[in-house]
Amino acid sequence: GACLRDVTLSVIPPVVERGQQARLVCQYDLENANLYSVKYYRGSYEFFRYTASEKGNMPQTKVFPIKGINVDLSHSNATQVVLTNVGHSLTGNVSCEVTTDRPFVMKVARARA
């Protein structure tokens, strides 16, 4: 059976200095499912979304503006989002939400930054 397993979120480096770069790495095992989307949140606010390609279209990435969160789109993809010039506002709960398509399964992994 296709299922989504083992979603984890890592913050690299574990202690992010203000003004530095941070990488949020969302790891997951799709088994036989198809990826639909990966969304990243700070608290309840989404700041980055990756949507897998459908019907031959290119994968889509979208950034949602949140003060203090600067996404480096050129280095962000289905498994990581890179933040530059990190502000104090990264502190707290960040999460990644992985959704599969056919069968539809959604799982969330949380981390502290």
Explain the meaning of each model-derived region.
Residues 1-14, 67:
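N-terminal Sec-dependent signal peptide, specifically the hydrophobic helical h-region
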Residues 10-12, 23-29:
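Short secondary-structure capping/turn segments at boundaries of alpha-helices and beta-strands
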Residues 14-20:
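Short, solvent-exposed loop/linker segments at the N-terminal edge
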Residues 25-27, 67-113:
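Ligand-binding face of N-terminal immunoglobulin V-set domains in extracellular IgSF glycoproteins
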Residues 31-67:
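N-terminal V-set
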